[in-house]
């Protein structure tokens, strides 16, 4: 296995022991991108000159034994809706093509302070709206396990780049499953932290009450290491939580004997494919063999998650995206002859089909006469979904189930069928609506396409999720999976 598939933990050890220089790691990563990414299409922009310069500076610090930082010399890829100072940030949209920010997002400041090295920006569904990365204005990313399949979305580039060995970790954002679903489709580990665990300052907003940044990696411990680096309260984000405990690695390796695991009957019901059910049931038996107590429970309002989510998320999107007006920044129509035309034409030409669909839906749901029937009712359903989880967590430590109801579908198969596309979020949207942490880990394959297992935890209890996910991972040989790639 080449260094491109080394874990974050192993790379840190190799660098600390001076067996490899940060500049050698960065060179190997760019060589891998040059070789593989013309096919995978995961990157939208590379920051090669600055990355090489930063790596050379880290080489000098390494020589002086001044290797400060939790991620010293580790390459990273960042979803293109996370602001990067001086590097184009487009949200994969024509609307923001050529937009170069003049400030840094909080997560990027933290990662730079930990001496990670930015490799480039990763493809995504436009403004994070989609489940296949096919709504990107620039390119369609493919699944590294099967190039005929989608990588999932909206963080498809983030998942594909990690799976293909193009970066050891990436950041994505998760509004209704946009980290966990592509992680499942691409056979990697994806964590959606508790709402408020990670600062959203510098994340281009889609749905502000749902969005959360999180890491994608090739194993569980790496994921915990990265989340430690990016977590914490932020004065620039009033929704970030003042929670001091950001230690996620100390319980990794501890057994799960006696851990109470809830398996909702709704998560293996109608709409979930047989191959996914079988993989999850096998995973449940593995958890039992490790000493966990697994019992069936009910989350009765699960079926209302998708309609509730799409009304709330689209409503918030219609408000958040109103700032893209063709005047202050972003795409500016050259054909307009009046201010009203400028607004209309810039937005009509700058936004893609899916983004416009959701703006229309959200504007309708918030309009006079329909607000109570749609938006207000959806918020009430959101409370019911949260109450379901609260009740289960009175007696259980974690919830387990599939991440997605199927494996990755083919490119072009669902892009013109929004309802079918939205149905893929059946098992992920309730977690966002309740503000809970959720992690997806690989649990098998069907016809060469990965299957994801989702663990859902109590608020700010990511530590327990990592503990149980790590123990499960020890029974699933990821080395062989990536060696085949």
Swiss-Prot record:
UniProt keyword annotation of Nucleotide-binding present: yes
Active-site residues, record numbering mapped to chain: 79, 154, 178
Documented EC number(s): 6.3.5.7
Top-rank taxon, per record: Bacteria
Keyword Transmembrane helix: no
Gene Ontology, cellular component aspect: glutamyl-tRNA(Gln) amidotransferase complex
Coiled coil: none
Keywords from the named record: ATP-binding, Ligase, Nucleotide-binding, Protein biosynthesis
Entries under Pfam families matching the protein: Amidase
GO annotation, biological process: translation
Protein family according to the UniProt entry: Belongs to the amidase family. GatA subfamily.
Subunit relationships: Heterotrimer of A, B and C subunits.
Classification via PANTHER family: GLUTAMYL-TRNA(GLN) AMIDOTRANSFERASE SUBUNIT A, TRANSAMIDASE
HAMAP family referenced in this protein's UniProt entry, alphabetically: GatA (MF_00120)
Function recorded in the entry: Allows the formation of correctly charged Gln-tRNA(Gln) through the transamidation of misacylated Glu-tRNA(Gln) in organisms which lack glutaminyl-tRNA synthetase. The reaction takes place in the presence of glutamine and ATP through an activated gamma-phospho-Glu-tRNA(Gln).
Descriptive protein name: Glutamyl-tRNA(Gln) amidotransferase subunit A
Gene that this sequence comes from: gatA
